[in-house]
Amino acid sequence: MSGMLLLTKAVFAIMIGFLGAVVLGLLLIPALKKLKVGQRISIFVGDNHKKKEGTPTMGGLIFIIPTLLATLLLIVTKKIELTTNLGIILLVFTGYAFIGFLDDYLSLKKKNNEGLTTIQKLLLQVLIALGFFYLYMKNGGQTALIVSTLGIHIEMSWFYGVFLLFILVGASNAVNLTDGLDGLAGGLSAIAFIAFSLISLMVGFEEIGIFTFVLTGALFGFLIYNAYPAKVFMGDTGSLALGAVMGAVAILTHREVTLLVVASVFVIETLSVILQVFWLFTFKKKLFLMTPLHHHFEKLGWGEQDIVKLFWVVGLILTMAGIFFGVWL
């Protein structure tokens, strides 16, 4: 396919994702307010966040629904092919969105932040990850970790299933942990998906690239409502879906190592939580003022918008490195 035609498809994909999210946001946010689907704010995050109490959650639907509908439209109109890989991605995206939606719904029903228990959520995530692994292997998926230019070829055999499960569950929870400031997780996800869109197209996964361009456009549309001051939060509905599909795209395009670079900010946020727990148990004191890391900066007196801008810039720089790594290495 010519580069110009591919570019046209990519631009169109971003546009329909963006417009779909903007329109749905206009309709959905008032409906969520009417239904009193408001986020309850933890007492531990400080007074700056208390004013956000009651902001509608489940806003992930604003980018999930347009992404699914636009992708189906592109398939029906034969602009992209419904390959097994794309089908798997859609199932993962929808499945993890459902887990998040269920968690958000139960949190609202109980009138606290306790939706699904940690075990329930983890079991559902693992169940979908196992389904992903089954479909991946049935479709002739490789079980080796490969970075061709560096001469890395590690045959993992059955252990690749554990590795895959770790990527999917880990990525979904990493985005979930990062979703603590207005626009933070949404902006970082949009930046990461731009990278995976370009990488997918360049290495021959056109249908995955177009899907991620649609999702990128929808995230830009969502950010109109989620950037500071947020009119809506994505909730677990959005964060779990974003992380899982990011992991799925990395696996299906054989860019698992690239994911570590492109999603470095998410990784750092998650590591800050792990290190904090380790430090508390080992040395009986905190390593950070508060985790995830963005809350540490808040405790240092940084403004919310300044933290988000810093994290976006770091994410953008690392994503550019990730594109180079993902295409040429």
Predicted segments — roles?
Residues 29-46:
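Membrane-interface loops
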Residues 2, 78-81, 108-109, 140-152:
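Membrane-interface helix termini and inter-helical loops of multi-pass transporters
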